[in-house]
Amino acid sequence: NTMAESVIFIREHGINSIKQLDKYIQKSAEERQDLQDKMKEIDKDMQLLSDTMEQVHTVKKYRAYYKEYKANPSDKAFFEEHKAEITHYEIALSKLKKSYSKLPNSKDILDKLNKLQEKKNTLIQEYSSTKSTMDELYQIRKNYGIYMGKEMER
């Protein structure tokens, strides 16, 4: 940013003091942080959905073993042979039951994941565009200090 561009920016935004400029920079930094927080929230939601997807897959994969075991609970040999599959099924099902009344649909989960990814991509674009804005603001802040006769640290 040239000195002239900095002066134009300051005038266009009605900034009349270093204090106002600092407030503007602070507000921009907070907006940038807000975008980052939203992205973290989306990441959390996506992780939960991915975990759910994995549990649904496990339940479907081992359901037959579990049904066979429930149909013949006295068949100890079958239980011993398929103990791992039955246990995986029970754990996955119990996790799903904490959040869902019936087995969630994989397609619905994928749709939600896709929507969240789109939202996140938009936020990422906004976030990266705020990076250059912040760099510009810090340069304007520096130029303002020089313009006013003293170099100021950001």
Specify the residue positions occupied by each region the protein language model found.
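Extended intrinsically disordered terminal tails
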Residues: N1-R154
